[in-house]
Protein backbone atom coordinates (compact mmCIF):
# COMPACT_ATOMS: atom_id res chain seq x y z
CA UNK A 1 0.00 0.00 0.00
CA UNK A 2 1.53 3.29 -1.11
CA UNK A 3 0.24 6.19 0.99
CA UNK A 4 2.00 8.65 -1.33
CA UNK A 5 0.02 7.42 -4.33
CA UNK A 6 -3.16 9.55 -4.57
CA UNK A 7 -4.99 6.90 -6.57
CA UNK A 8 -4.26 4.32 -3.88
CA UNK A 9 -5.54 6.71 -1.21
CA UNK A 10 -8.65 7.36 -3.30
CA UNK A 11 -9.25 3.60 -3.50
CA UNK A 12 -8.73 3.28 0.25
CA UNK A 13 -11.37 5.91 1.02
CA UNK A 14 -13.78 4.61 -1.61
CA UNK A 15 -13.65 1.09 -0.18
CA UNK A 16 -13.96 2.43 3.37
CA UNK A 17 -17.10 4.35 2.41
CA UNK A 18 -18.47 1.29 0.57
CA UNK A 19 -17.99 -0.87 3.67
CA UNK A 20 -19.47 1.84 5.87
CA UNK A 21 -16.53 1.54 8.25
CA UNK A 22 -16.24 5.30 8.66
CA UNK A 23 -19.60 5.31 10.40
CA UNK A 24 -19.30 2.27 12.64
CA UNK A 25 -19.18 2.56 16.41
CA UNK A 26 -16.50 0.40 17.98
CA UNK A 27 -17.34 -1.08 21.36
CA UNK A 28 -19.92 1.65 21.93
CA UNK A 29 -17.14 4.19 22.28
CA UNK A 30 -15.28 5.81 19.40
CA UNK A 31 -16.02 5.63 15.71
CA UNK A 32 -14.01 6.49 12.62
CA UNK A 33 -15.95 9.70 12.02
CA UNK A 34 -15.02 10.96 15.49
CA UNK A 35 -13.41 14.31 14.60
CA UNK A 36 -11.04 14.50 17.62
CA UNK A 37 -9.88 10.94 16.92
CA UNK A 38 -9.21 11.74 13.26
CA UNK A 39 -7.42 14.98 14.14
CA UNK A 40 -5.25 13.19 16.67
CA UNK A 41 -4.13 10.67 14.08
CA UNK A 42 -3.62 13.37 11.46
CA UNK A 43 -1.44 15.43 13.83
CA UNK A 44 0.79 12.43 14.49
CA UNK A 45 1.14 11.76 10.78
CA UNK A 46 1.90 15.41 9.98
CA UNK A 47 4.57 15.57 12.67
CA UNK A 48 6.25 12.41 11.39
CA UNK A 49 6.09 13.75 7.83
CA UNK A 50 7.66 17.06 8.89
CA UNK A 51 10.59 15.22 10.46
CA UNK A 52 10.76 12.92 7.41
CA UNK A 53 10.47 9.90 9.64
CA UNK A 54 9.00 7.79 6.85
CA UNK A 55 9.37 4.42 8.57
CA UNK A 56 7.43 5.53 11.65
CA UNK A 57 4.88 7.31 9.44
CA UNK A 58 4.27 4.10 7.53
CA UNK A 59 3.89 2.27 10.83
CA UNK A 60 1.49 4.91 12.16
CA UNK A 61 -0.73 4.59 9.08
CA UNK A 62 -0.58 0.79 9.24
CA UNK A 63 -1.43 0.72 12.96
CA UNK A 64 -4.32 3.16 12.54
CA UNK A 65 -5.76 1.02 9.76
CA UNK A 66 -5.48 -2.14 11.87
CA UNK A 67 -6.85 -0.58 15.06
CA UNK A 68 -9.77 1.00 13.23
CA UNK A 69 -10.62 -0.71 9.96
CA UNK A 70 -9.09 -4.08 10.84
CA UNK A 71 -10.95 -4.37 14.13
CA UNK A 72 -14.19 -3.23 12.53
CA UNK A 73 -13.91 -5.89 9.82
CA UNK A 74 -13.25 -8.59 12.40
CA UNK A 75 -16.30 -7.48 14.36
CA UNK A 76 -18.47 -7.47 11.25
CA UNK A 77 -17.27 -10.90 10.17
CA UNK A 78 -18.18 -12.35 13.55
CA UNK A 79 -21.58 -10.75 13.96
CA UNK A 80 -23.15 -10.35 10.52
CA UNK A 81 -23.93 -13.32 8.30
CA UNK A 82 -24.31 -12.78 4.54
CA UNK A 83 -27.84 -13.11 3.23
CA UNK A 84 -28.21 -15.64 0.45
CA UNK A 85 -31.56 -14.20 -0.59
CA UNK A 86 -30.46 -10.62 -1.22
CA UNK A 87 -28.40 -9.36 -4.12
CA UNK A 88 -25.16 -7.76 -2.98
CA UNK A 89 -24.57 -4.08 -3.68
CA UNK A 90 -21.58 -3.98 -6.07
CA UNK A 91 -18.56 -1.84 -5.33
CA UNK A 92 -18.13 1.10 -7.73
CA UNK A 93 -14.79 2.89 -7.83
CA UNK A 94 -15.42 6.55 -8.66
CA UNK A 95 -12.10 8.14 -9.57
CA UNK A 96 -13.50 11.34 -11.10
CA UNK A 97 -16.29 13.61 -9.98
CA UNK A 98 -19.53 14.54 -11.74
CA UNK A 99 -19.38 14.93 -15.54
CA UNK A 100 -15.69 13.99 -15.98
CA UNK A 101 -16.55 10.54 -14.59
CA UNK A 102 -18.85 9.88 -17.56
CA UNK A 103 -16.61 11.55 -20.15
CA UNK A 104 -13.33 9.95 -19.07
CA UNK A 105 -14.94 6.54 -18.55
CA UNK A 106 -16.31 6.74 -22.10
CA UNK A 107 -12.85 7.76 -23.34
CA UNK A 108 -11.38 4.60 -21.80
CA UNK A 109 -14.09 2.47 -23.40
CA UNK A 110 -13.44 4.05 -26.81
CA UNK A 111 -9.68 3.53 -26.44
CA UNK A 112 -10.35 -0.14 -25.71
CA UNK A 113 -12.51 -0.44 -28.83
CA UNK A 114 -9.86 1.34 -30.93
CA UNK A 115 -6.97 -0.84 -29.75
CA UNK A 116 -8.43 -4.30 -29.14
CA UNK A 117 -12.20 -4.09 -29.62
CA UNK A 118 -14.73 -3.52 -32.34
CA UNK A 119 -13.02 -0.49 -33.93
CA UNK A 120 -9.53 -2.01 -34.25
CA UNK A 121 -9.93 -2.66 -37.99
CA UNK A 122 -11.52 0.74 -38.67
CA UNK A 123 -9.94 4.02 -39.75
CA UNK A 124 -12.73 6.27 -38.46
CA UNK A 125 -15.06 6.35 -35.47
CA UNK A 126 -18.80 5.94 -36.05
CA UNK A 127 -20.85 9.14 -36.02
CA UNK A 128 -21.60 10.94 -32.77
CA UNK A 129 -25.21 9.78 -32.99
CA UNK A 130 -24.24 6.11 -33.40
CA UNK A 131 -21.75 6.32 -30.54
CA UNK A 132 -24.40 7.97 -28.38
CA UNK A 133 -26.79 5.10 -29.04
CA UNK A 134 -24.16 2.38 -28.68
CA UNK A 135 -22.79 3.58 -25.33
CA UNK A 136 -25.97 5.06 -23.86
CA UNK A 137 -24.73 8.62 -23.38
CA UNK A 138 -25.74 12.00 -24.78
CA UNK A 139 -24.37 13.35 -28.04
CA UNK A 140 -22.82 16.25 -26.13
CA UNK A 141 -20.92 13.76 -23.93
CA UNK A 142 -19.66 11.98 -27.06
CA UNK A 143 -18.54 15.32 -28.50
CA UNK A 144 -16.60 16.23 -25.32
CA UNK A 145 -15.05 12.76 -25.22
CA UNK A 146 -13.90 12.89 -28.83
CA UNK A 147 -12.35 16.29 -28.14
CA UNK A 148 -10.40 14.69 -25.29
CA UNK A 149 -9.24 11.86 -27.58
CA UNK A 150 -8.08 14.49 -30.07
CA UNK A 151 -6.07 16.20 -27.34
CA UNK A 152 -4.63 12.83 -26.27
CA UNK A 153 -3.48 12.14 -29.84
CA UNK A 154 -5.48 8.93 -30.24
CA UNK A 155 -7.86 10.53 -32.75
CA UNK A 156 -8.07 13.41 -35.23
CA UNK A 157 -11.34 15.05 -36.23
CA UNK A 158 -11.32 15.97 -39.93
CA UNK A 159 -13.96 18.34 -41.31
CA UNK A 160 -16.20 16.59 -43.80
CA UNK A 161 -14.79 13.13 -43.10
CA UNK A 162 -15.24 12.28 -39.44
CA UNK A 163 -12.87 11.29 -36.67
CA UNK A 164 -9.72 9.46 -37.75
CA UNK A 165 -8.43 6.93 -35.21
CA UNK A 166 -4.97 5.45 -34.75
CA UNK A 167 -4.79 1.78 -33.82
CA UNK A 168 -2.08 -0.37 -32.31
CA UNK A 169 1.19 -0.07 -34.20
CA UNK A 170 0.21 3.16 -35.98
CA UNK A 171 2.11 6.37 -35.23
CA UNK A 172 -0.37 8.84 -33.78
CA UNK A 173 -0.47 12.55 -33.07
CA UNK A 174 1.55 14.03 -30.23
CA UNK A 175 -0.61 14.49 -27.11
CA UNK A 176 -1.45 18.08 -26.23
CA UNK A 177 0.36 18.34 -22.91
CA UNK A 178 -1.11 21.82 -22.42
CA UNK A 179 -4.47 20.14 -21.87
CA UNK A 180 -5.22 19.71 -18.14
CA UNK A 181 -7.31 16.59 -18.84
CA UNK A 182 -4.45 14.95 -20.73
CA UNK A 183 -1.91 15.72 -18.01
CA UNK A 184 -4.32 14.57 -15.30
CA UNK A 185 -5.04 11.25 -16.96
CA UNK A 186 -1.39 10.60 -17.73
CA UNK A 187 -0.80 11.09 -14.00
CA UNK A 188 -3.58 8.57 -13.31
CA UNK A 189 -1.94 6.19 -15.80
CA UNK A 190 1.29 6.40 -13.79
CA UNK A 191 -0.51 5.91 -10.48
CA UNK A 192 -2.52 2.96 -11.85
CA UNK A 193 0.71 1.37 -13.08
CA UNK A 194 2.12 1.67 -9.56
CA UNK A 195 -1.00 0.07 -8.09
CA UNK A 196 -0.54 -2.80 -10.52
CA UNK A 197 3.13 -3.16 -9.58
CA UNK A 198 2.28 -3.52 -5.89
CA UNK A 199 -0.76 -5.78 -6.27
CA UNK A 200 -0.31 -7.96 -9.36
CA UNK A 201 1.59 -10.74 -7.56
CA UNK A 202 -1.24 -11.62 -5.18
CA UNK A 203 -4.02 -10.97 -7.71
CA UNK A 204 -2.46 -13.09 -10.47
CA UNK A 205 -1.78 -15.96 -8.07
CA UNK A 206 -5.34 -15.95 -6.77
CA UNK A 207 -6.84 -15.63 -10.25
CA UNK A 208 -4.79 -18.49 -11.70
CA UNK A 209 -5.64 -20.72 -8.73
CA UNK A 210 -9.37 -20.02 -9.14
CA UNK A 211 -9.69 -19.76 -12.95
CA UNK A 212 -11.31 -22.53 -14.95
CA UNK A 213 -9.01 -24.56 -17.24
CA UNK A 214 -10.73 -23.11 -20.30
CA UNK A 215 -9.99 -19.55 -19.19
CA UNK A 216 -6.30 -20.35 -18.75
CA UNK A 217 -6.19 -22.10 -22.14
CA UNK A 218 -7.65 -18.97 -23.75
CA UNK A 219 -4.92 -16.79 -22.20
CA UNK A 220 -2.29 -19.29 -23.35
CA UNK A 221 -3.69 -19.17 -26.89
CA UNK A 222 -3.62 -15.35 -26.93
CA UNK A 223 0.00 -15.25 -25.81
CA UNK A 224 1.04 -17.93 -28.30
CA UNK A 225 -0.63 -15.98 -31.12
CA UNK A 226 1.21 -12.81 -30.04
CA UNK A 227 4.55 -14.62 -30.30
CA UNK A 228 3.70 -16.13 -33.69
CA UNK A 229 2.59 -12.79 -35.16
CA UNK A 230 5.45 -10.83 -33.61
CA UNK A 231 2.97 -8.56 -31.81
CA UNK A 232 3.77 -8.92 -28.12
CA UNK A 233 3.07 -5.27 -27.26
CA UNK A 234 -0.36 -6.19 -25.90
CA UNK A 235 0.52 -9.25 -23.84
CA UNK A 236 0.70 -7.28 -20.60
CA UNK A 237 -2.77 -5.87 -21.36
CA UNK A 238 -4.04 -9.41 -22.00
CA UNK A 239 -2.80 -10.55 -18.60
CA UNK A 240 -4.36 -7.49 -16.99
CA UNK A 241 -7.69 -8.25 -18.67
CA UNK A 242 -7.41 -11.89 -17.59
CA UNK A 243 -7.24 -10.76 -13.96
CA UNK A 244 -9.94 -8.11 -14.46
CA UNK A 245 -12.35 -10.63 -15.99
CA UNK A 246 -11.63 -13.80 -14.03
CA UNK A 247 -10.67 -12.88 -10.47
CA UNK A 248 -12.99 -14.69 -8.07
CA UNK A 249 -13.57 -11.41 -6.18
CA UNK A 250 -15.99 -8.85 -7.61
CA UNK A 251 -14.14 -5.97 -5.94
CA UNK A 252 -10.82 -7.00 -7.48
CA UNK A 253 -12.45 -7.28 -10.90
CA UNK A 254 -13.82 -3.75 -10.50
CA UNK A 255 -10.47 -2.31 -9.43
CA UNK A 256 -8.52 -4.05 -12.19
CA UNK A 257 -10.98 -3.00 -14.88
CA UNK A 258 -10.40 0.59 -13.78
CA UNK A 259 -6.62 0.07 -13.78
CA UNK A 260 -6.89 -1.33 -17.32
CA UNK A 261 -8.96 1.68 -18.42
CA UNK A 262 -6.36 4.09 -17.05
CA UNK A 263 -3.58 2.02 -18.66
CA UNK A 264 -4.98 2.79 -22.11
CA UNK A 265 -4.31 6.52 -21.69
CA UNK A 266 -0.57 5.91 -21.76
CA UNK A 267 -0.38 4.23 -25.17
CA UNK A 268 -0.75 7.33 -27.41
CA UNK A 269 2.22 8.97 -25.70
CA UNK A 270 4.44 6.04 -26.62
CA UNK A 271 2.98 5.74 -30.14
CA UNK A 272 3.52 9.46 -30.85
CA UNK A 273 7.26 9.53 -30.16
CA UNK A 274 9.14 10.29 -33.39
CA UNK A 275 12.10 8.22 -32.29
CA UNK A 276 10.01 5.96 -30.15
CA UNK A 277 11.48 3.38 -27.85
CA UNK A 278 12.69 0.15 -29.38
CA UNK A 279 10.62 -2.91 -28.51
CA UNK A 280 11.61 -3.94 -25.01
CA UNK A 281 13.20 -7.42 -25.04
CA UNK A 282 11.78 -8.10 -21.58
CA UNK A 283 8.20 -8.16 -22.89
CA UNK A 284 9.01 -10.91 -25.41
CA UNK A 285 10.88 -12.84 -22.73
CA UNK A 286 7.92 -12.37 -20.39
CA UNK A 287 5.49 -13.66 -23.02
CA UNK A 288 7.57 -16.75 -23.78
CA UNK A 289 8.11 -17.45 -20.08
CA UNK A 290 4.42 -17.12 -19.30
CA UNK A 291 3.51 -19.48 -22.16
CA UNK A 292 5.95 -22.04 -20.76
CA UNK A 293 4.64 -21.69 -17.21
CA UNK A 294 0.99 -21.89 -18.32
CA UNK A 295 1.71 -25.10 -20.23
CA UNK A 296 3.33 -26.56 -17.12
CA UNK A 297 0.52 -25.26 -14.87
CA UNK A 298 3.23 -23.42 -12.91
CA UNK A 299 1.35 -20.67 -11.07
CA UNK A 300 4.39 -19.30 -9.23
CA UNK A 301 6.37 -19.13 -12.47
CA UNK A 302 3.60 -17.04 -14.09
CA UNK A 303 3.36 -14.79 -11.04
CA UNK A 304 7.10 -14.14 -10.88
CA UNK A 305 7.31 -13.41 -14.61
CA UNK A 306 4.46 -10.89 -14.35
CA UNK A 307 5.87 -9.20 -11.25
CA UNK A 308 9.28 -8.78 -12.91
CA UNK A 309 8.04 -7.33 -16.20
CA UNK A 310 5.57 -4.95 -14.51
CA UNK A 311 8.38 -3.55 -12.34
CA UNK A 312 10.56 -3.06 -15.42
CA UNK A 313 7.82 -1.44 -17.49
CA UNK A 314 6.73 0.81 -14.63
CA UNK A 315 10.23 2.27 -14.39
CA UNK A 316 10.29 2.74 -18.17
CA UNK A 317 6.86 4.43 -18.18
CA UNK A 318 7.95 6.87 -15.50
CA UNK A 319 10.97 7.79 -17.62
CA UNK A 320 8.74 8.38 -20.69
CA UNK A 321 6.49 10.74 -18.76
CA UNK A 322 9.34 12.75 -17.26
CA UNK A 323 11.12 13.05 -20.62
CA UNK A 324 7.90 14.29 -22.21
CA UNK A 325 7.68 17.19 -19.78
CA UNK A 326 5.56 16.03 -16.87
CA UNK A 327 6.97 17.02 -13.51
CA UNK A 328 7.44 14.53 -10.65
CA UNK A 329 4.93 16.43 -8.51
CA UNK A 330 2.34 16.22 -11.30
CA UNK A 331 2.44 12.44 -11.13
CA UNK A 332 1.09 12.80 -7.61
CA UNK A 333 -1.95 14.94 -8.45
CA UNK A 334 -4.69 14.30 -5.95
CA UNK A 335 -7.79 12.61 -7.39
CA UNK A 336 -11.16 13.40 -5.89
CA UNK A 337 -11.86 11.76 -2.53
CA UNK A 338 -15.56 11.59 -1.78
CA UNK A 339 -15.97 12.15 1.95
CA UNK A 340 -19.74 12.57 1.80
CA UNK A 341 -22.33 10.10 0.58
CA UNK A 342 -25.00 11.89 -1.40
CA UNK A 343 -28.10 10.86 -3.29
CA UNK A 344 -26.94 9.68 -6.73
CA UNK A 345 -29.98 11.32 -8.33
CA UNK A 346 -29.29 14.83 -7.04
Predicted features, each with a name:
Residues 1, 11-23, 60-83, 163-172, ...:
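Short, structured interface segments
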Residues 1, 33, 44, 48, ...:
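Long, mid-chain structured domain cores
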Residues 1-23, 60-68, 213-269, 304-313:
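Conserved amphipathic alpha-helical segments that form helical-bundle/coiled-coil interaction surfaces
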Amino acid sequence: FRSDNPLAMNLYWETSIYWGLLFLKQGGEKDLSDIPLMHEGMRRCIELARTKDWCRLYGQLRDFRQISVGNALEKLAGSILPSADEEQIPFVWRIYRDRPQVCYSLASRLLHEIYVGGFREDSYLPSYEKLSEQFGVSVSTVRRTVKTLNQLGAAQSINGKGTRIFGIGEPCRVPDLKSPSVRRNLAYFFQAFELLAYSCEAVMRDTLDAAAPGEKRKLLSQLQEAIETGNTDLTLWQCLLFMANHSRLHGVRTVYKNIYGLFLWGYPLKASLVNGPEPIPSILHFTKSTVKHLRENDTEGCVNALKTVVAQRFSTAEGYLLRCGLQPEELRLTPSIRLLITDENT
